[in-house]
Amino acid sequence: MDPRGILKAFPKRQKIHADASSKVLAKIPRREEGEEAEEWLSSLRAHVVRTGIGRARAELFEKQIVQHGGQLCPAQGPGVTHIVVDEGMDYERALRLLRLPQLPPGAQLVKSAWLSLCLQERRLVDVAGFSIFIPSRYLDHPQPSKAEQDASIPPGTHEALLQTALSPPPPPTRPVSPPQKAKEAPNTQAQPISDDEASDGEETQVSAADLEALISGHYPTSLEGDCEPSPAPAVLDKWVCAQPSSQKATNHNLHITEKLEVLAKAYSVQGDKWRALGYAKAINALKSFHKPVTSYQEACSIPGIGKRMAEKIIEILESGHLRKLDHISESVPVLELFSNIWGAGTKTAQMWYQQGFRSLEDIRSQASLTTQQAIGLKHYSDFLERMPREEATEIEQTVQKAAQAFNSGLLCVACGSYRRGKATCGDVDVLITHPDGRSHRGIFSRLLDSLRQEGFLTDDLVSQEENGQQQKYLGVCRLPGPGRRHRRLDIIVVPYSEFACALLYFTGSAHFNRSMRALAKTKGMSLSEHALSTAVVRNTHGCKVGPGRVLPTPTEKDVFRLLGLPYREPAERDW
């Protein structure tokens, strides 16, 4: 979506004036006027165990239970019907956390995915496939074997369960999306460069974002304590990374998705990540659907679209409009304007709005800015304007010429959308290495000094970011000549042993990269911009507890081969 999409969507909308004294950012209404909560959970008496689920997500579950007629009660309380625990929880650990010798009579121990599915379907669903296995020593009679249990689960139940994992997970202490372009940094030393984003190369857990990487929503999981690599998914062609992006489906529902994208962007700039994710899931599902949606029932049948979303789809079909668009807070276009400043994330944009700022001129004259934000504001228009491919080529050649003046054997490759063959680029990422594995050392500082002396580098955003053996520079460049714009440039120097994985990482789209990492994880492997490792040990929450063994990957083709994937040319990684 165009970075200024919301501003374009509402150029003449009359503003709704909020109480000027309010310091709380207005939120999009949770439900339409006159809409009443349904009590379809009235028979539920639940206790939510927060361990593993996380406080924020547990509180969301509890709020939804009460809102829809259910009751919250202690685990040992009379009449408790369901005890909800984290996906990776086993029976004995649950009892220890609850400080109970055994489950209360009539209580069922269920995974949080069951409650997510109930909330998604707006009904109490069967717990088959969601119950925590109870060891036979805790039973008065033998429990059916796992094979018997699996045989009793209707086909498709596991897939439905895995789809529900897109419900809000506990907010992580750091983002679980792949490392993004720098957004905020208090100084030019290496550190998290956004108040909303940070990275160490590989996500610590496969999250809702990873699940978006699967077209079908299919996501194999492993049992606790299973350190053996999981088998590859039965149908690899359901993974984004297994398909060429040239085969993207035609969007038969553009008239619907373009309106939902405005809402998704509005939620995103307001910091409502989970609701934005829900809309993104529905938008992706609609874009992949093989025909135009024509009815409520048809919308409900699409995986990833619930009843409430289906109602919005039908409203658009019947009226050509979505009433929620009329209720978008007046803060949203301003927040989008502010968050487009390089160095300012969602939190900073909200802070500025709460301080009374409403324009870039307000920010320029009144806000306290970091060095990076001041640079981002100075080049605001240039950074938002995508550069033609020819300009990106000139930038790559300028860096290459300067590097090879020190050593003619250095390899310099522009990655990102440029390497994927796009006609325009937002910025340029240049990878530098040397085949001998040694001569790249010491080139980083000398190259930057040379480019500064030429006047090619005009501003430093992050002068040096150490990432293992990789060194990364984030800055601003401008080609010589009248009318040239300032452009974002990243220069990354990597050892040759990591070059293939770095090339793969900095070339693929965010969606493609998430899919590759998620697939690697299902195989007991780990993929980052540094290496592909096997025999990686993870705990029940998906966090690595053993680094595994690094596999040799001389070329990108080796990475695809080791993951059991057909090789995809850079132009086919543009999901």
Curated annotation (Swiss-Prot):
Which keywords belong to this entry? Chromosome, DNA damage, DNA repair, DNA replication, DNA synthesis, DNA-binding, DNA-directed DNA polymerase, Lyase, Manganese, Metal-binding, Nucleotidyltransferase, Nucleus, Transferase
Which catalytic residues are annotated?
A: 312 (schiff-base intermediate with dna)
Q: Which residues bind Mn(2+)?
A: 427, 429, 490
Q: What's one GO-annotated cellular component?
A: nucleoplasm
Name the needed cofactors: Mn(2+)
Q: Which reaction does it catalyse?
A: DNA(n) + a 2'-deoxyribonucleoside 5'-triphosphate = DNA(n+1) + diphosphate
Residues in the signal sequence: none
Q: What is the lineage of its organism?
A: Eukaryota, Metazoa, Chordata, Craniata, Vertebrata
What this protein is called in its record is DNA polymerase lambda
